[in-house]
Curated annotation (Swiss-Prot):
This is UPF0473 protein Exig_2070. InterPro entries: UPF0473. HAMAP family: UPF0473. Belongs to the UPF0473 family. It comes from the Bacteria.
Amino acid sequence: MQQNEPTHYVIPDGEGNEFKFAERLRYESPRSSKTYIFLEPVGADYDEAEEVDIFVYELEEYGEGDDDFNLVPIAEDDAETWDEIEEVFNTLEDELD
């Protein structure tokens, strides 16, 4: 089975430093009808790491183009959404193992 190359994103921080991420998963919540994107950092600093943090954002699309979206942080106190995201991520990890 041929796997597609992951989509990559370059995201700047508040100081103008740019970081590269690979899309690990895109998930549409049946509960909220929102789309969430799971991003994994890529690059020399992460290639040999035993564990890598996964960053999850709400994907807010505002146009028809591939680049017409915002990544919206999920509120830390939104326990219902975080529980759902954790369940989706754990299911993905189980399938990959």
